[in-house]
Regions:
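An acidic- and aromatic-residue-enriched active-site/binding cleft used to recognize and process polar
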Residues: 101, 118, 126-132, 155, ...
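Transmembrane beta-barrel wall of Gram-negative outer-membrane proteins
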Residues: 107-129, 138-170
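Short acidic, glycine/serine/threonine-rich loops at helix termini
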Residues: 136-137, 173-176, 380-385
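Flexible loop and strand-edge segments within Gram-negative outer membrane beta-barrel domains
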Residues: 159-217, 244-252, 272, 375-377
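N-terminal low-complexity tails
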Residues: 257-262
Length: 621
């Protein structure tokens, strides 16, 4: 299969010295898998609706540093300043992705735009929108995420980035369905007829945040030329305001659902907000043998955060302070070593996060990657303290968690093989029990994982496979599938005098029997439950995806199993069934236009075409 060779590179505000190649425009799995939860290497579990609360089904370590509110169920759908790509080219760039399901209220839109102006100034914008009514009563998800910024280089020594981002998450909360025993019966007229556990249809989640960030880089020594050592100072200041709210003002029919959290029969409300001001100052030195790919980076700095917290009805303010360090050695495509460290000071004494990654290429023999992450961090806010309707539900004195993760990956691109072994060890693990209450384990939690991917090509046919295995020593506190498989079998070839690229076939996924977590909308948390067990369920999608130049189109019929089995539902979250079979389509196109004469001067740190490496941060969605 031919690759898209457009010389399109991008960088990030915190490290403009390093460039990365942009995604291609092939009609591949990432294109046709429109749902962010299914774009992950192993699918995340959701509430069955596009844009709904989600969590990993293969355990993942969440990097932590200082204060954390503990609200992460919607992270897949958000945009933040650190994620904004600035495209390093002399042409205007725009890309749009749109997908729609059965109705006009089942759609999503992703859009990117970038332009370089005279003098090297660069503007970049990302926008995401999800508006999905859902198949069941009162489960609509409506999200908007926006991030835009300006990159302003002055001469060869200064780079300034101003970025603004805003996320608004809205989810109607129906509590899941009461029973699925009516599925397939004569009186069942479709998912909309299923009774839900919050029948008043008044419970609503709204999470909103906005961030304004200014990053400035000043080079004291060295310049933009190749092979010169640079000494640079970087200052970043970011202000963030966040408001998280759940409310249900109609408890006449909904009171039974809330159980532990029913503090006031007139209505339930959980509200918290905070203002956060982050300041970081970093001194770094690096040298680039090839522009856009520094061969070594060494940096040290301080990071301070001031937080003004309103956890209704209590107000508080406090600070976090960390010493930071980074070392990166990438002398060639065949070797990369990255080490990062963060050490807590003053009130954060005893907290830390240390990570390292080694990447070695052996040519045709393959590639080896290995990494480690060790961190000690305090409980997130909602593990520590919770108010519901201004009444204290809990205030815990939990110990700080200590987490160590280690992985090794061997890849042999020649035969499309990649194998990863990973282990996690967590002391003082925190979770939410069957009542949705915060709990801490007294004994360590250990998880072992093995993931293998094999992509096979036989003429025009492709067979792509990912199989993941995981096992923990504490099935009483962590309940995830022991195995997961996702596979694609399809035809891939060019038609109509090689003008049209066609991929057509089936996507398949299945996981082992497990007890999926329940979801508590009051706290926006997944928690243990004992009432439902999900057995292996064959999820089959039929698809066709096309590409003509930079225009792409897909159509797919999802969950074909419901064509012949109308009585069985599958769950990734207890009482929230995945949708029945339905058709979905999507389109995407990319434009690259030359700017006006005199407007194509790239920023001073612009790398030449074909520089950059695939090692490093990538977009999330």
């Amino acid at each position: 299969m031919e690759r898209d060779t457009s010389p399109l590179l991008f960088t990030f505000a915190l490290a403009p010295e390093r460039a990365y190649p942009a995604d291609d425009t092939l009609p591949d799995r990432r294109f046709r898998m429109y749902d962010p939860a299914r774009r992950q290497p192993v699918d995340w579990g959701t509430l069955g609706n596009l844009g709904s609360a989600a969590r990993p089904l293969l355990y993942e370590t969440l990097p932590r540093l200082g204060f954390d509110a503990g609200v992460h169920a919607f992270d897949l759908y958000k945009l933040y300043p650190d994620d904004l790509r600035f495209y390093r080219n002399g042409r205007s760039f725009s890309e749009v992705y749109f997908s729609q399901g059965r109705t006009q209220l089942d759609g999503m839109l992703d859009a990117r735009f970038a332009r370089t102006f005279a003098g090297g100034a660069n503007f970049s914008l990302d926008y995401r929108s999800i508006n999905n009514l859902g198949a069941y009563r009162y489960q609509r998800d409506k999200h908007n995420a926006l991030s835009f910024g300006i990159w302003l280089p002055v001469g060869s020594r200064y780079d300034g980035f101003v970025i603004f981002s805003k996320n608004v998450i809205r989810q109607q909360e129906n509590g899941g369905i009461v029973t699925d025993t009516i599925f397939g019966k004569e009186q069942f007229s479709g998912p909309i007829s299923a009774e839900v556990r919050l029948p008043a249809q008044a419970a609503l989640t709204r999470l909103a945040d906005q961030t304004l960030q200014l990053t400035q880089h000043l080079k004291f020594a060295g310049g933009s030329g190749e092979g010169k050592r640079v000494l640079r100072a970087t200052h970043t200041i970011a202000w963030m305001k966040a408001d998280y709210k759940f409310a249900d003002a109609s408890l006449a029919q909904d009171s039974f659902f809330f159980d532990t959290f029913l503090t006031d029969r007139r209505g339930i409300r959980h509200f918290l907000s905070f203002n956060r001001l982050d300041n970081s100052f970093i001194i770094s030195t690096f040298k680039a043998k090839t522009r856009g790919r520094p061969s070594d980076v060494l940096s040290v700095g301080l990071r301070h955060s001031f937080l003004d917290l309103n956890q209704e009805p209590r107000d508080s303010s406090f600070s976090n302070l960390f010493l930071t360090g980074n070392m990166t050695i990438t002398p060639s495509d065949g070797f990369a070593l990255v080490a990062q460290g963060n050490l807590g000071l003053l009130s954060n004494f005893g907290e830390y996060r240390i990570s390292g990654e080694l990447d070695i290429g052996f040519g045709k023999v393959g590639r080896l990657r290995a990494g480690i992450l060790s961190q000690r961090y305090p409980p997130s806010l909602l593990f520590y303290r919770l108010f519901v309707s201004k009444r204290l539900m809990w205030q815990n004195d939990f110990a700080k968690s200590l987490e160590n993760s280690l992985y090794a990956t061997y890849a042999l691109p020649l035969i499309g093989l990649e194998m990863t072994a990973r282990t996690h060890l967590i002391n003082n693990y925190l979770y939410y029990n069957q009542k949705g209450v915060a709990v801490q384990t007294a004994s360590p939690l250990q998880i072992a994982q093995f993931i293998i991917s094999e992509n096979i090509g036989l003429g025009p046919f492709r067979f792509e496979n990912t199989v993941a295995l995981q096992q923990s020593n504490r099935s009483d506190v962590l309940r995830l599938p022991h195995w997961f498989t996702k596979n694609s079998l399809y035809f891939s070839g060019k038609l109509f005098k090689k003008r049209l690229q066609l991929d057509a076939g089936v996507d398949f996924r299945m996981n082992s029997e497990f007890r999926p977590d329940a979801y508590q909308p009051v706290t926006w948390q997944f928690h243990l439950q004992d009432s439902l067990t999900q057995k292996p369920y064959p999820w089959i999608d039929l698809f066709a995806a096309f590409k003509v130049q930079s225009f792409r189109f897909f159509v797919r019929y999802e969950n074909m199993s419901t064509i012949w089995n109308k009585t069985e539902a599958t769950y990734q979250t207890a009482r929230y069934p995945q949708p029945f079979g339905a058709i979905r389509f999507g389109i995407a196109w990319r434009f690259m236009d030359s700017n006006e004469k005199g407007a194509g001067t790239p920023p001073a740190s612009e790398p030449p075409p074909n520089s950059g490496t695939g090692i490093g941060p990538k977009g999330r969605g």
